[in-house]
Structure formats: structure tokens, C-alpha cells
Amino acid sequence: MADYREHYLEIRSAGASVVAVSVDAPDKSEALRVHLALPFPILCDTEHRVVRDWGIYNSGEKGGIAKPAVFVIDPGSVVRYAAVDTVVRRVPAAEIVSLLQNAADVQSVRRRVYIPLFSDWISAIRNLIQR
């Protein structure tokens, strides 16, 4: 989400909005939004309805979370681009900015490799133990 914070003004300048969706409770989502200084809202899907309907529900993590994903939806509610990612491969926000600014072929958007930090590994191990 921090990547989208860094490109937020470019995304808005291209005429788009940014919204994050989380399965966390509203207070936890708001704390994260404040901690990361996100200029966009985090919508809460505590019953996992939206993430299930959009095919991004990951039941194997923390009792069920959303997979990292990006959707570009036009004003007519048509999904123009969708990427369901993994922890280690994500579409950079700069690629979405390019897509929006140039009306580029959506197939040209590339994912980048994310190298997990040590703290990410610790979190993943805790998730496995909590199962």
C-alpha cells in the first residue's frame, strides 16, 4: 500500500481513485492507514464477502485474508485490469499509473519481485503456527 501512497497524486491526476480493501476490523484498518500515512481509505470487509466474490480470498493465512490484488475499474463499473498477486510478486503502482496515463495495453503491465524482509518471514512463521 505504501507504493500506492507514493504514486497517489499521479493516480489522481490520471483521473482515478485509490481504495484499499481489508478483512481487518475498522479500528485496525484505520490504525494501519494512519501508520502508513495513506491518503486513501481502507474499506473493511470483515465478513469476507467482497474478497470471496472477487476471488481474492486466502483462507490459508491468519484465518483468512485478502490476497494482494489490483483492479482498475472504469466509471461504467467495467473491470479494465485485474491482477491477483502473491506476497513476492506484485504490480508496481508506477505500472498502474502508466496504464492510466497512456491507456496502455493492459497485458503490458509487469509485476516486480518483492524480497521479503526478515520480519515478513517471522510473521509468516507465526501464521503457520497459529493454524
What are these regions (language model features)?
Residues 1-131:
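Chalcogenol-based redox active-site neighborhoods
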